[in-house]
Amino acid sequence: MGATAESAAEQSAGTAPAGRLGFRPGQAVQEFGYDDDVDEALRASVEALTGNELADEDAQDVVDAAIYWWREDDGDLVDALVDALTNLADGGVIWLLTPKSGRPGHVEPSEIEDAAPTAGLHATSTISACQDWTGTRLATPRGGRR
């Protein structure tokens, strides 16, 4: 059991960040806002847990979830969220990842709270996603967005 337990523990440690965000094996996840400041360990964790590479923002396939790296100067958040909804399956979620308070590009929570309903979403929770990024889970209201 020793080797199996170690392997499971190592695997769990590698996928723990993605697990905190609620990702599951087999899910397709689209990524938006990639730049050199993203958390590579979180990206790798999502890919390891889901068993799929992250689809880039130009992908056209339907996805179960999206992660969006968003910084203060990235533009109009409402437009960005609407774009992220394009390929999102019914019942899918968007994790909006923003720099933590005190870090360059920090986004005030009130900006997210204002933008989400305009885009047809609501924030359901906010967590520390990784060392430098806060994650806000955005979902469509029950009954869908259409």
Q: Where does each model-flagged region fall?
A:
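S-adenosyl-L-methionine-dependent methyltransferase catalytic core, i.e., the SAM/SAH-binding region
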Residues: M1-R146
